[in-house]
Amino acid sequence: MKAVKQKSKGGRPPLDKAGDVERRLLDAALQLFLERGFEDTSCEDIARLAGAGKASLYARYANKDAIFEAVVRRDVDTQPLPAAASVPLDLEGRLRHAGQGILAHALQPQTVAMMRLVVGTSIRAPALAAEVNRIGWEGGLRRVQMTILDGPDQPANPSALASHFVDLVFAPHQLRALLGEHPDDLIATASARVEWALALLKDAGQLETGSPQ
């Protein structure tokens, strides 16, 4: 007698599959947001492309805004840390290394496209755009803070130094990328941007360190 194969009843996926559903939903959302823009993408489109039911989508994300935030947060959280330097670096060297890594990621075509998407949502949904921008900015800030703390030579105010460094290094190149300047030109000037920022911070006394503890 042949065993009768039970049909899936749908509903919530097993725990070992839940992460895969989330990944597919965010992959689909990213693809559609970049192809169509935020306004012309619906939650139904995302669920369909992901091969998931609308119930699965809404069980995880309240609305399209929440999906958009999750897409950006995943990009920030999965951004690789700068490769470890081959030799120990002083504070200035660590910041130089981190700054080059931040700009390398920021100038990638998909990153620039995501930034343009955020700008495009700012008129209709300024609160959403502000929140998404905060997520991205804080992600870069955390990486710089980790870089600063990864050594015995510590500045008087690591948090302030990290914030000023991110603003000086990232914001100008971000604006130029959004305005359509060729990525190759921006990449070619990335090192000079980092050196300019370090020079300003040094002149302001923010790179001065105390004795190792």
Model-derived features: positions:
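C-terminal peripheral helix-coil segments that are non-catalytic and often amphipathic
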Residues: 1-12, 142, 146, 150, ...
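Amphipathic alpha-helical packing segments from all-alpha helical-bundle domains
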Residues: 93, 112-113, 126-153, 163, ...
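Amphipathic alpha-helical linker/stalk segments
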Residues: 69-99, 106
